[in-house]
Amino acid sequence: MVAMVKVLVVAKVYPDSVERNLEEMVENIKKSLPEGYELLQYQKVPVAFGLNLLKVYVAMPEETEGGTEKLEEVLKGVEGVSEVEIETVHRMSY
């Protein structure tokens, strides 16, 4: 049996305002992810002056053409997202 290899991508997702509902953003991110991608967990991280960002942990297929580019585009397309920064990428298998 061949193990399916995925990568774990940790990304910082910045909201467009302090008032943005981060739980709603998480739900929209889940709905927006393509087949084969999975939001494993997320954290709210304080930035400054009441602004929080989302740190999202997404599993995606390793053999994705363009690497994390597709994921970045999907995340940037979610309502309320102003910026996306890929923090780390780790290979995982299960």
Swiss-Prot record:
Q: Which Pfam families match?
A: EF1_GNE
Q: Which Gene3D superfamilies match?
A: 3.30.70.60
Keywords attached to this Swiss-Prot or TrEMBL record, sorted alphabetically, are: Elongation factor, Protein biosynthesis
Q: Does the keyword Lipid metabolism apply?
A: no
Protein biosynthesis listed as a keyword: yes
Question: What does it do?
Answer: Promotes the exchange of GDP for GTP in EF-1-alpha/GDP, thus allowing the regeneration of EF-1-alpha/GTP that could then be used to form the ternary complex EF-1-alpha/GTP/AAtRNA.
Q: What is this protein called?
A: Elongation factor 1-beta
Organism source for this protein? Answer: Ignicoccus hospitalis (strain KIN4/I / DSM 18386 / JCM 14125)
**What does UniProt list as this organism's lineage?**
Archaea, Thermoproteota, Thermoprotei, Desulfurococcales, Desulfurococcaceae
Q: Which gene encodes it?
A: ef1b
